[in-house]
Amino acid sequence: MTTLKNDRFLRALLREPVDTTPIWMMRQAGRYLPEYRETRSKAGDFLSLCKNTEFACEVTLQPLRRYDLDAAILFSDILTIPDALGLGLYFETGEGPKFHKTVRTEQDVANLPKLNAKADLDYVMNAVSTIRSALGGQVPLIGFSGSPWTLATYMVEGGSSKEFRFTKQMMYAQPEVLHALLDHLADSVIDYLNAQIDAGAQAIQIFDSWGGALAHREYVEFSLNYMKKIIAGLQREKDGRRIPVIVFTKGGGQWLEPMITTGADALGLDWTTPLNTARTTVAGRVALQGNLDPAVLYGSAASIEKAVKAMLDDAYANGEKTGYVANLGHGITQWVDPAQPKIFVDTVHEYSAKYLG
């Protein structure tokens, strides 16, 4: 196996010393990059881009050619699992993802097949192994999945939603049906992520994008408990190294204490949670990742530098020198000038040396 040349991302997640703060960006391979748009155009559509190993590898590597990033993340979509379960994923321009079928009854849940990730999602595993090989040990590769709760919202609603009407209706009127669906999805995610690890993923992130739509008790019952089940079922070591796991619940900064119980090595934060407060709350028990508002990248070079330095000051305010990975608080948007993320990345590396040097 190729020796990893830059492992500071993995070391930071495990709260080990690093020489400078590692950084990657959620959605770092995306529409803001002209080379991504060109590759997507060649692929024809988004799903074809995800399912073509060569294209998926190319777009994964594109941001690493522009920026001094400390990790690559598999280019794929969180909805690959529901698609493999037979719901029929498709995308409508301007409307986001949709499914031909929904899951709204006990019978719908019972009809879902058992996922065999290595067979049903072989294109994802081919992409992971191809990207890992193409990286040549430059930086670690992150694999990922959506959380059961987040996947369930798309499956029950039939696509994106702001109110989650049908999912919350199920949660309060037929909680046993929702639990059956979430349990099925947790098993599917375990199989999916373990297959990614076998294929070469060196760290895992669970995207709980819609966990923040829940009240506290419901968050624990319908989201957090299933992420805990997943983490307990994951292969945690490969090639002599621990496979760190990051849990990111958007809008979940108030739940850091219960999130620690999931067994995750690190917790992702969005921009609404002050890093210094979060550091005090977790008290060195887990690493933290985040949390620049992606909209900061619309600003001038000076304003980006100022915001990044303030974020780092918060991250290291309590004197801790380990357990922090810089990132955005959510995915980078398509309207960002590709020159701006370089300011973010370079400022993180240069300014953090003040604390870590």
From Swiss-Prot:
Annotated residues for binding of substrate: 27-31, 77, 154, 209, 330
Pathway(s) served: Porphyrin-containing compound metabolism; protoporphyrin-IX biosynthesis; coproporphyrinogen-III from 5-aminolevulinate: step 4/4
Catalysed reactions, as listed in the record: uroporphyrinogen III + 4 H(+) = coproporphyrinogen III + 4 CO2
Assigned EC number: 4.1.1.37
Protein localization: Cytoplasm
InterPro entries in the cross-refs: UROD/MetE-like_sf, Uroporphyrinogen_deCO2ase_HemE, Uroporphyrinogen_deCOase
One example GO MF annotation: uroporphyrinogen decarboxylase activity
GO annotation terms (biological process): protoporphyrinogen IX biosynthetic process from glutamate
EC class name: lyase
Site (Transition state stabilizer): 77
Alphabetically ordered keywords of this record: Cytoplasm, Decarboxylase, Lyase, Porphyrin biosynthesis
Assigned GO CC terms: cytosol
PANTHER family assigned to the protein according to its UniProt record, in alphabetical order: METHYLTETRAHYDROFOLATE:HOMOCYSTEINE METHYLTRANSFERASE RELATED, UROPORPHYRINOGEN DECARBOXYLASE
Subunit text: Homodimer.
Family statement: Belongs to the uroporphyrinogen decarboxylase family.
Function: Catalyzes the decarboxylation of four acetate groups of uroporphyrinogen-III to yield coproporphyrinogen-III.
HAMAP family, A to Z: URO_D
Name of the protein in question: Uroporphyrinogen decarboxylase
Organism: Acinetobacter baumannii (strain AYE)
